[in-house]
Amino acid sequence: MIRLIKILFLFYCLATVSFFQPFDLVSAQAAKAISYSLLMGLLVATCLSSVSKRKSNERFRTPMVWLMILFGVACFIPTLCNFDQSVLQSFSVTLPFFSYALYFTMHRFSFNEDFIHKIIFALAICTIITHIINLITFPVIIFGTPQDEYDLSRGGIRLVMIGFSFVVLSFFITIDKWLRTKAPKWGIFAMACYIAIFLSYTRQHILICTFLGFLMLFNHVHWYKKVIILGLGCILVMSIFPKIPAVQNMIELTQEQNERNRGNETEDIRIQAAKFYGYEQFPSLANRLFGNGVFTFKSAWGRQMQAVTESERVYAVDVGIFGFNWSFGIFSIVCLLVVFYKAIVVRSQKYVVGRYYFIWLFVSSFASGALLYPSQIIVTVIVLYLIDTYNYKRLYLCGLKSA
């Protein structure tokens, strides 16, 4: 049974990245149908499992349970508010968010750390390889769809990187492994992940990952090495990075956007989106607390919202945490903040990788859709489980030593 659950979990992870869509053989709709079926199967298996006792190492249990309840409430909001969208339609489009419940699946069937790391590394490697192939074959898109957006204004080809969050997580894990073991393979893997992050040409991710990567190195070495790392970092930032053509283009693009925003009466597009999803579009206090629900383009309300967002050019994926707030309300945001707090701030949380990942997730969620994509949700769930596993193992070993 456990072996079958692990296979289903692996295939679900692949489905969240649409199986990398080679030559568009697996359409987005087919991948979505497969992922929905796998997710439902995993959740049903979790509910039917004979193991019902609460485990002591589920530190995120309470906020995750409340998130599931609030997601369920959100399925009824559009119908109760007469938004012209049925409960069934709302459930079908909200279902990917229930993948947060896979946190309980992983605990229920006690996934081992090696299995999880293999999934993370395999998908990160596949992401890097497929992205490089797409860059080489551009404008022909081999992995993905021809409709995927691209941008040539940043000194390189900015393409959609399927499975990006697996690369980010692998970046932090491999740095941690290299610091602990000094094995060259982990250092090489970390560099490959960083290069892939840079090739995404997404400014906030490059800046955040660069800063956090240096911080990981800085916090794990002696003081004299800290001075060396700090010096090298200053040299890179002040002298080398600005001379890289892609970096120059991204700096110039940022300056142009700032000048354009100052010259125009209209605000920055992300500030407009943050206002739209943060506090402007809530018909009542109940909607502010519980959200508006998730809309689907198959409903009249969804088509109306699509027209509004297109005309005003405000997109939830540009301001993920505000988009999450719009769909699920303040109570859900509070649950998320509790998760962030337990993963980042609480001193008993000793899993360094988890802390750095959640710092990246929290900061990037203000300017990307990091909380909204299924492929990023599943990575977040994996990290939550790894935090629990690492800290429980650490407490167990401490107990053995003191006995």
Report each predicted region and the residues it spans.
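Long extracytoplasmic/lumenal interhelical loops at the membrane interface
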Residues: 264-328
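Hydrophobic transmembrane helix bundles of membrane-integrated enzymes that assemble
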Residues: 1-255, 310-401
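Flexible juxtamembrane loops connecting transmembrane helices in multi-pass membrane enzymes
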Residues: 28-31, 239-276, 287, 299
